[in-house]
Amino acid sequence: MEQMHSLESSLPPEQPPTKQAIESLNLELSQEFKLAANAVTRLYRVANEKNSLTKHQGYLTCLDDILCALDSNVTADELRAWCYKRRNDILSNSQDKSLNPVKERERKLNKFSENQHRENEAHKEPFEKDSAVKYNFSFNESNGDLSNINENIAPKFRLSMPPLSVEHPPRNASRIKSWKARTINHGRGDTRNLNDITGLGHERERDRENTHYEKKPKLDSDSEVDIRSFRQDMDL
């Protein structure tokens, strides 16, 4: 990219660097500037001429309309009212065109806000109904008169169905029941299981004490030599 960018400055000149070539280029440059200035001047002149012609054409159109109204036997008051009406129509149309983008943007914003508010209300109503049905607890019906409650009595809670995360498969039902039974018996002070465990521990200790470990006799050097020779014969 740098090489392409530097091509304009690195290209060789088309003419030899002499005084005559430089003077001819200066004359050509000044002539081009004059042509550009004349083109811009001509452009402004044509634009102004067009605007003036448009204004004169509009004025002539207005005069033609007034002459047509006079030829149709219109009174001066009616003609004045007609002129005011046309004037107001033209001014109102120009104002509407200038303010049209702003009004359109405001209208879209208002419509969007109304739609958002309507959607929020539509989502809010069923949620409020569901919450009112699910969480409408009545504590007075279950407890009755709250003034007659004894503080020393522990409250009772009704059993309910456990959630899905707490339910166990059938294969683990027996194991869970036995574990619950042991837990309940232990909580009630049943010492039978504890005695069984302690008795089992004593029996294991007695078995460990009665167990005798026979020590292997230490072999002398002759017997070790005999064993080595026997193993070598077996290998052969």
Swiss-Prot record:
Annotated region described as Disordered, given as residue ranges: 186-236
Compositional bias segments (type: Basic and acidic residues): 201-236
UniProt-listed Pfam families: TAPR1-like
Keyword Signal: no
A GO cellular component annotation in the UniProt record: nucleus
Disulfide bonds: none
Modified residues (Phosphoserine): 221
Record keywords, A-Z: Phosphoprotein
InterPro entries reported for this sequence: HAPSTR1-like (IPR029196)
PANTHER family, alphabetized: CHROMOSOME 9, WHOLE GENOME SHOTGUN SEQUENCE, YALI0F12243P
Record's miscellaneous remark: Present with 1890 molecules/cell in log phase SD medium.
Protein name as catalogued: Uncharacterized protein YJR056C
Organism for this UniProt entry: Saccharomyces cerevisiae (strain ATCC 204508 / S288c) (Baker's yeast)
Lineage: Eukaryota, Fungi, Dikarya, Ascomycota, Saccharomycotina
